Amino acid sequence: QKKIPLYRRSFSNKHATGSVITGDVERTYETFMTHKDNVVLLKLHLIDLSYMLEEMFARLFAIFDNHRIHINLVHNTAVDIYIAVDSSWHIDDVVSELMATGLDVDKQENVEIITIRHYDDEIYRRYDLDENIIIKQVSPQSIRIVRNKIVN
């Protein structure tokens, strides 16, 4: 970045002093968190241990779409895919259809999704040590966690 300042002046008042816009301003962001409960986590595993390919993803998403089930999070590895969805009375029908496509399906109810934007080290450490975490997705700006619901 060249960090060239931008000088601004008013068109309506040509005698007024202008302002300078530079890239020296440090941006600060508030940390915020969202929480979603009443979520079901499905772990899909190909029985023949082949890799999840694009065609399989298309079939999976079509099944969820046909039952109008909202997908909240997708996490995949070479042979497994985890899909967190809203709880629905259609979920058992979806599980049956997924199994009919050659998938082994594990259904885990009573999970929650926590998304934290603009986290700091303290928040990261707090959630890094949580033994209830099933899935954790970390990027420089956010953390998404799927964990067993904690009942107080």
Model-assigned labels for residue ranges:
Residues 1-152:
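C-terminal catalytic "cap/lid" subdomain
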